[in-house]
C-alpha cells in the first residue's frame, strides 16, 4: 500500500508534464472487476481501487513519428499486444479504449503458459515467451514488462523491448534508444 501511495504522489506531482503515463496491469484489473485475484488485498480493495483510478491507467500508449528522418511508432503496454489475441477477439487496438474494466472482458484472458485457460494472453496477461511465438500487433516497436522471471537485464530486440528487470528505463525520444534511468 505504501508503494502504491508513493506512486500516486509521484504521478500527481508530474501531471503538468506529459512524460508520465500509467499502464493498467493484471494486478490492477482485479481490483476493478474482481477476477483473477492474484496478490489481491480484500481488506483494502476500495482504497486500492481509488488510488489506481487516480493514476488514470491506460491499456496502451502510442508514440509515433518522433523524427521525420526515421519515423517509428512505439506501442507501450503492460504485457505486449499480439495480432493473434486481437484477431481471436475480433478487436482492433482502438477497441481497447472502449473496454469496461469493471466487467469481465478479453482483458481477463490468461494464457496457458501462466496457468490460464486461453490460447492467447491479453495485453495485461501475456508472457514474453508467448509474445515471441505470436505475431506482434502491426508495425509498432513494442515496449512492455510483466515477465520478470528473475531477470536483471532487459530483453531488447529489433521489434520489441521487455523491460521487467527491476530497473527503471526511459525512451530517449531524440536518439530513439531505451536507456536505464539513473535517479
What are these regions (language model features)?
Residues 1-54, 61:
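Core catalytic region of metal-dependent phosphoesterases/phosphodiesterases
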Residues 20, 59, 74, 160:
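Short, conserved active-site loop motifs that form the nucleotide-linked donor/cofactor pocket
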Residues 24, 76-77, 162:
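Short hydrophobic beta-strand that contains or immediately precedes a catalytic carboxylate
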Residues 26-27, 78, 143-148:
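Histidine-centered divalent metal-coordination motifs
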Residues 29-33, 77, 83-87, 150-153, ...:
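Short catalytic/ligand-binding loop motif for oxyanion handling, primarily in non-cytosolic enzymes
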Residues 43-50, 65-135:
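Active-site-proximal loop/helix segment associated with metal-binding centers of metalloenzymes
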Residues 58-69, 170:
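Short, surface-exposed beta-strand/loop micro-motifs that present aromatic residues
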Residues 127-182:
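Conserved beta-sheet core of the metallophosphoesterase superfamily
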Amino acid at each position: 500500500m505504501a508503494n502504491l501511495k508513493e506512486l500516486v504522489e509521484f504521478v500527481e506531482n508530474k501531471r503538468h508534464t506529459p512524460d508520465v503515463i500509467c499502464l493498467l496491469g493484471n494486478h490492477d484489473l482485479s481490483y476493478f472487476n474482481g477476477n483473477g485475484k492474484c496478490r489481491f488485498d480484500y481488506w483494502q480493495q476500495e482504497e486500492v481501487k481509488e488510488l489506481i483510478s487516480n493514476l488514470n491507467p491506460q491499456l496502451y500508449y502510442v508514440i509515433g513519428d518522433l523524427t521525420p528522418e526515421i519515423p517509428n511508432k512505439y506501442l507501450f503496454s503492460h504485457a505486449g499486444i499480439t495480432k493473434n489475441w486481437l484477431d481471436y477477439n475480433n478487436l482492433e487496438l482502438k477497441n481497447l479504449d472502449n473496454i469496461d474494466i469493471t466487467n469481465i472482458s478479453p482483458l481477463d484472458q490468461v494464457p496457458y503458459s501462466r496457468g490460464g485457460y486461453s490460447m492467447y494472453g491479453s495485453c495485461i496477461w501475456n508472457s514474453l515467451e508467448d509474445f515471441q511465438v505470436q505475431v506482434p500487433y502491426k508495425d509498432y516497436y513494442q515496449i512492455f514488462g510483466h515477465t520478470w522471471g528473475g531477470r536483471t537485464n532487459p530483453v531488447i530486440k529489433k521489434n520489441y523491448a521487455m523491460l521487467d528487470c527491476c530497473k527503471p528505463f526511459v525512451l530517449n525520444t531524440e536518439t530513439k534508444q531505451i536507456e536505464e534511468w539513473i535517479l
